[in-house]
């Protein structure tokens, strides 16, 4: 195989927690890890421009294979010169495989060895997605990091079902590698499945490591399981993965889960949470989250977070943002989205600094105490 387009550089381990500080090198630049990746489902991070994402120091964003396959279609993106040119983003892009959307959005699906028959969630048309098709679409999109097409089992799932699912995901992963025809330009990550069963996670990791992917994702978490289950699964799964490859926990983006994931050896995270809740008027602050629709902000002329130096907090007040959100003004959604993404990207910078200083455990305690996670009945984000 030619030299891998995706390379992980280990920098240091936190003596207090074992968390990793590293750097991922891609054809479109490098980024330090642990990293949070904003989600740009349809080749746009909702309400944000690429320039704004760069201003908050996003080194990599995620786009969605399933959605781009349906609209505008991978051929149009390819004709534009690939996803980077299409959306005017010259930093790294990761595309998911479409597997999660097939299993979560489509009410009518039939899984067989060849792939999955399902219905388009927009118009009900019959569609078929296979490992080969997922690779064809992602090769056309031209992302830096592609994901293997996996089966996404429901939570909770019976052991026997999960065992069959893991075996199929391993077979599909091999088919993805064989179908991936731009291996010198795009890195393909395998996805470890197995639910909360340690022996199945072990088998899944073993199968995928034998195929020598340039990176590995941990799938099947953040699907409704309690936080302690997720942490337990990470504790026995991340040590199975190679130390010289990046580890990506899919679909995780609440502040507590980002910190706890980093402590358990995860390098990369993505989630729609910060952008989705922003559009409902909910924002992160160092002292917990706020709902900007709340009447108590009507005459509150402070910034969302007095410690935050983002564009929103430097220029606008809670009262103004509440007014915009209540009037359904697009600018309000832009301001809350900007702040939430900046908050999580800055949080990951704090996590990386704490690893450098061997004090991530202390940082976790300080952050959880201020944010309110230690209170009884604390919300998850």
From Swiss-Prot:
<keyword id="KW-0671">Queuosine biosynthesis</keyword>
<comment type="similarity">
    <text>Belongs to the queuine tRNA-ribosyltransferase family.</text>
</comment>
<dbReference type="GO" id="GO:0005829">
    <property type="term" value="C:cytosol"/>
</dbReference>
<comment type="subunit">
    <text>Homodimer. Within each dimer, one monomer is responsible for RNA recognition and catalysis, while the other monomer binds to the replacement base PreQ1.</text>
</comment>
<dbReference type="InterPro" id="IPR050076">
    <property type="entry name" value="ArchSynthase1/Queuine_TRR"/>
</dbReference>
<dbReference type="Pfam" id="PF01702">
    <property type="entry name" value="TGT"/>
</dbReference>
<dbReference type="GO" id="GO:0002099">
    <property type="term" value="P:tRNA wobble guanine modification"/>
</dbReference>
<dbReference type="GO" id="GO:0008616">
    <property type="term" value="P:queuosine biosynthetic process"/>
</dbReference>
<feature type="region of interest" description="RNA binding; important for wobble base 34 recognition">
    <location>
        <begin position="275"/>
        <end position="279"/>
    </location>
</feature>
<dbReference type="GO" id="GO:0008479">
    <property type="term" value="F:tRNA-guanosine(34) queuine transglycosylase activity"/>
</dbReference>
<dbReference type="GO" id="GO:0046872">
    <property type="term" value="F:metal ion binding"/>
</dbReference>
<feature type="binding site">
    <location>
        <position position="150"/>
    </location>
    <ligand>
        <name>substrate</name>
    </ligand>
</feature>
<feature type="active site" description="Proton acceptor">
    <location>
        <position position="96"/>
    </location>
</feature>
<dbReference type="GO" id="GO:0101030">
    <property type="term" value="P:tRNA-guanine transglycosylation"/>
</dbReference>
<feature type="binding site">
    <location>
        <begin position="96"/>
        <end position="100"/>
    </location>
    <ligand>
        <name>substrate</name>
    </ligand>
</feature>
<dbReference type="GO" id="GO:0005737">
    <property type="term" value="C:cytoplasm"/>
</dbReference>
<feature type="binding site">
    <location>
        <position position="193"/>
    </location>
    <ligand>
        <name>substrate</name>
    </ligand>
</feature>
<protein>
    <recommendedName>
        <fullName>Queuine tRNA-ribosyltransferase</fullName>
        <ecNumber>2.4.2.29</ecNumber>
    </recommendedName>
</protein>
<keyword id="KW-0808">Transferase</keyword>
<dbReference type="InterPro" id="IPR004803">
    <property type="entry name" value="TGT"/>
</dbReference>
<keyword id="KW-0479">Metal-binding</keyword>
<comment type="function">
    <text>Catalyzes the base-exchange of a guanine (G) residue with the queuine precursor 7-aminomethyl-7-deazaguanine (PreQ1) at position 34 (anticodon wobble position) in tRNAs with GU(N) anticodons (tRNA-Asp, -Asn, -His and -Tyr). Catalysis occurs through a double-displacement mechanism. The nucleophile active site attacks the C1' of nucleotide 34 to detach the guanine base from the RNA, forming a covalent enzyme-RNA intermediate. The proton acceptor active site deprotonates the incoming PreQ1, allowing a nucleophilic attack on the C1' of the ribose to form the product.</text>
</comment>
<feature type="binding site">
    <location>
        <position position="313"/>
    </location>
    <ligand>
        <name>Zn(2+)</name>
    </ligand>
</feature>
<feature type="binding site">
    <location>
        <position position="339"/>
    </location>
    <ligand>
        <name>Zn(2+)</name>
    </ligand>
</feature>
<keyword id="KW-0328">Glycosyltransferase</keyword>
<feature type="binding site">
    <location>
        <position position="220"/>
    </location>
    <ligand>
        <name>substrate</name>
    </ligand>
</feature>
<feature type="binding site">
    <location>
        <position position="310"/>
    </location>
    <ligand>
        <name>Zn(2+)</name>
    </ligand>
</feature>
<feature type="region of interest" description="RNA binding">
    <location>
        <begin position="251"/>
        <end position="257"/>
    </location>
</feature>
<dbReference type="InterPro" id="IPR036511">
    <property type="entry name" value="TGT-like_sf"/>
</dbReference>
<keyword id="KW-0862">Zinc</keyword>
<comment type="pathway">
    <text>tRNA modification; tRNA-queuosine biosynthesis.</text>
</comment>
<feature type="active site" description="Nucleophile">
    <location>
        <position position="270"/>
    </location>
</feature>
<feature type="binding site">
    <location>
        <position position="308"/>
    </location>
    <ligand>
        <name>Zn(2+)</name>
    </ligand>
</feature>
<keyword id="KW-0819">tRNA processing</keyword>
<dbReference type="InterPro" id="IPR002616">
    <property type="entry name" value="tRNA_ribo_trans-like"/>
</dbReference>
């Amino acid at each position: 195989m030619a030299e891998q387009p995706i390379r992980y550089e280990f920098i240091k381990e936190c003596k207090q927690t074992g968390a990793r500080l590293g750097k991922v090198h891609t054809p479109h630049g490098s980024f330090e890890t642990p990293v949070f990746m904003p989600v740009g489902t349809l080749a746009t991070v909702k309400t944000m421009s690429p320039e704004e994402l760069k201003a908050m120091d996003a080194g990599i964003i995620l786009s969605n294979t399933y959605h781009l396959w349906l609209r505008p279609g991978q051929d149009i993106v390819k004709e534009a010169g690939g996803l980077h040119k299409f959306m005017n983003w010259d930093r790294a892009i990761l595309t998911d495989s479409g597997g999660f959307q097939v299993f979560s959005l489509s009410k009518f699906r039939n899984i067989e060895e060849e792939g999955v028959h399902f219905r388009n969630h927009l118009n009900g048309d019959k569609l078929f997605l296979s490992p080969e098709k997922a690779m064809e679409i992602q090769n056309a999109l031209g992302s830096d990091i592609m994901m293997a097409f996996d089966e996404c089992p429901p939570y909770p799932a019976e052991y026997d079902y999960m065992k069959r699912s893991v075996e199929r995901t391993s077979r599909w992963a091999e088919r993805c590698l064989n179908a991936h025809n731009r291996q010198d330009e795009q890195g393909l990550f395998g996805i470890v499945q197995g639910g909360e069963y340690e022996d199945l996670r072990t088998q899944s990791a073993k199968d995928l490591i034998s195929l020598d992917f340039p990176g590995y994702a941990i799938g099947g978490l953040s699907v409704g399981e309690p936080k302690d289950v997720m942490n337990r699964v990470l504790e026995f799964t991340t040590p199975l993965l190679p130390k010289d490859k990046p580890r990506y926990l899919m679909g995780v983006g609440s502040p507590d889960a980002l910190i706890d994931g980093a402590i358990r050896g995860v390098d990369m995270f993505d989630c729609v949470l910060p952008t989705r809740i922003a559009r409902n008027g909910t924002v992160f602050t160092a002292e917990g989250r706020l709902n900007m629709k709340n009447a108590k902000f009507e005459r509150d002329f402070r910034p969302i977070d007095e410690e935050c130096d983002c564009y929103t907090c430097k220029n606008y007040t809670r009262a103004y943002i509440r007014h915009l959100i209540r009037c359904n003004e697009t600018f309000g959604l832009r301001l809350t989205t900007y702040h939430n993404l900046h908050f999580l990207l800055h949080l990951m910078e704090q996590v990386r600094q704490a690893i450098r200083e061997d004090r991530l455990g202390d940082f976790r305690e300080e952050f959880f105490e201020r944010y309110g996670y230690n209170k009884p009945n604390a919300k998850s984000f």
